[in-house]
Regions:
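Hydrophobic membrane-targeting and insertion signals
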Residues: 5, 21-23
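Mature, Sec-exported extracytoplasmic domains of Gram-positive
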Residues: 23-213
Length: 213
């Protein structure tokens, strides 16, 4: 009996009892990280679902020659060349920025298909609709889709009230569910309650596992 008590004490001291390693963090441990991630997500949401990166207009005579030798086969009609003044100049650069904020799983399953590949959307009323990739590369050029049928337009950005942030169940040491008050940028008098999910990466870094739009 005595040996059993000693063994139990050792196990407790090592923190290896079932469930010990999955304890949800305290809000104070992740608060600053959540604020950092949400603030960084605004830029990414604009790139993926908003106006996107700046591009050269076809109606400007100075840029017309740039469109005369389009080589992006199958994409040329509604794609414009991303401006040299843009913050990002390739798919890889956008991905590097996105993967510092959003989880790999969320990006690969939800964001990247519409951003870089294109996808089919099925609807009962409209049937199957193809959504063009938002960004494509061809040789040394980087393009953004600018067609009138672009359907992935972001709603008005949400403003989060970080003071209302709280951890809710089910949460653990690798996945945290958060709840806080937010409102659309142009409707501060109409707050709502939203939920965000954090996930711990293999490198031990907290990332958003849900979109902030």
């Amino acid at each position: 009996m005595k040996k059993g008590c000693v063994l139990l004490a050792v196990i407790i001291s090592l923190g290896v009892l079932p469930g010990c390693s999955s304890r949800a963090p305290e809000l104070s441990e992740i608060y600053d990280r959540v604020v950092e991630l949400v603030e960084a997500s605004y830029e990414l949401n604009e790139i993926f679902y908003g106006d996107g990166l700046p591009y050269y207009g076809r109606n400007l005579e100075i840029y017309a020659p740039m469109y005369s030798d389009y080589t992006t086969e199958g994409y040329t009609r509604d794609y414009n060349i991303v401006s040299d003044l843009a913050k990002y100049h390739s798919v890889d650069e956008i991905k590097m920025a996105a993967e510092r904020v959003y989880s790999q799983a969320l990006l690969e399953e939800v964001v990247y298909p519409s951003a870089f590949t294109g996808l089919l959307i099925s609807g009962a009323a409209s049937g199957t609709q193809y959504v063009n990739a938002r960004y494509v590369e061809s040789e040394d050029d980087f393009y953004i889709y600018a067609g009138e049928d672009q359907t992935l337009t972001s709603p008005t950005p949400l403003i989060y009230d970080y003071a209302t942030m709280e951890i809710v169940r089910p949460s653990n040491g690798e996945r945290v569910l958060l709840r806080m008050t937010a409102w659309e940028e142009d409707a501060p008098d109409s707050p709502t309650t939203v939920k965000l999910t954090l996930t711990l990466s293999e490198d031990g870094v907290w990332l958003l596992d849900s979109l902030t739009v």
